Amino acid sequence: MFRNDAISVAEVMKLKPKGIVLSPGPCTPNEAGICLELIEKAGPKIPLLGVCLGHQAIGQAYGGEVIRAPAPMHGKLSKITHTGKSLFKSLPKSFEVTRYHSLIVGRKGLPDSLIATAKTADGIIMGLQHKTHPVHGVQFHPESIASEHGHALLANFLELAGLAPRRRNAKPARHAA
């Protein structure tokens, strides 16, 4: 784990990560350290998951516009619907998520390279996916205990990145005496 202003893109790429999570933060994508450049460099080949600010950075990096949300959503729950694919594979068609943001990726001018994969009832984009790169973003916080199916969504990202955890046997291993 690294702060987005405490490591360079070159240093990240040297680490040869199998997946990258761009985490939340209190600023705009322009103020988010190396995030925009990292999306540009790593996005075509390394699976990326952007959460909140990371989602906004993905939208901006590919030509979308980050705008003020109609209302600040700090600690609010919203029901979303989604495509049922990629990050949302095998999840209920609609579920509640936790939101902590005042900025969003705007619907108008969403670049052709990005697909909105989840939204609220009033049409706010809650999920994005790049059409050809292994890049995904969610505006909400799947890591929040109040977000339904957050662990399953994160497990889906790990699977997409080829990092799905191995299943363990329920029985403990026997040791020779």
Regions of interest found by a model, annotated:
Residues S86-T132:
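Catalytic beta-strand/loop cores that center a nucleophilic Ser/Cys/Thr
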Residues I7-K16, G109:
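Short amphipathic alpha-helix with an adjacent loop that forms part of the alpha/beta core around
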Residues K14-S90, S94, L154-N156:
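Cysteine-nucleophile active-site neighborhood
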Residues M1-I7:
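A short beta-strand-loop structural module common to alpha/beta enzyme folds
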Residues T132, G137-E148:
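Phosphate-binding/catalytic loops
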Residues S144-A177:
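Acyltransferase
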Residues L77-K79, I125-G127, G137:
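Conserved hydrophobic/aromatic beta-strand scaffold that supports enzyme active sites
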Residues C52, H101, H141:
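Histidine-centered divalent metal-coordination motifs
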